[in-house]
Amino acid sequence: MPMTLGYWNIRGLAHSIRLLLEYTGSSYEEKKYTMGDAPDYDRSQWLNEKFKLGLDFPNLPYLIDGTHKITQSNAILRYIARKHNLCGETEKEKIREDILENQLMDNRMQLARLCYDPDFEKLKPEYLEGLPEMLKLYSQFLGKQPWFLGDKITFVDFIAYDVLERNQVFEPSCLDAFPNLKDFISRFEGLEKISAYMKSSRFLPRPVFTKMAVWGNK
């Protein structure tokens, strides 16, 4: 029986999950919820089901796999990754994995807060000013390795791809000074199952955010 991934009909927090499901060849179907237009942004499609799915902490995204019902995007990623041996193995790898996972979420939220802020245009220059320093740290952390934990791809690479690539969408030249990050993006997109998914009708790179966002809402 296929797993069910529930989320808004956007890229958002589900992008890395969808990529990981595709990479692992997992059998899944999507339940995509649509948000209404301004000014009400009607969310009844989701709210009507929210407390009827048996989720401990009802939220989007969610993954239902038989009796396992999971919310929180990173918990979902870790669940899929454990099934397919796509987690760090040594203590050093696990430490890098934990640091990177949380750092990426901080930076993901930083961009999201900006893009939902009514003062977006006023705040954007400050974000762009700090972007090179942020990316420099990721570049140093990756170093000359193909993947962030070393020679083996793990679930944090899927989060890293999402965060780095959405910053590239936001500011197309932002990775130009970091060849290893650009190579990482190309390497990831060149993976056979990822490449096939990106060419399919299932692929959903846009909109990045919901209709309530100032940037990335289309």
From Swiss-Prot:
Annotated ranges, domain GST N-terminal: 2-88
Subunit-level organization: Homodimer.
Native species: Macaca fascicularis (Crab-eating macaque)
GO function term, MF aspect, one: glutathione transferase activity
UniProt-annotated binding residues for substrate: 116
Keywords assigned by UniProt, alphabetized: Cytoplasm, Lipid metabolism, Phosphoprotein, Transferase
Designated name of the protein: Glutathione S-transferase Mu 2
Pfam families tied to this protein: GST_C, GST_N
Annotated GO CC locations: cytoplasm; intercellular bridge
List of residues binding glutathione: 7-8, 43-46, 50, 59-60, 72-73
Domain of life assignment: Eukaryota
CDD domains linked to this entry: GST_C_Mu, GST_N_Mu
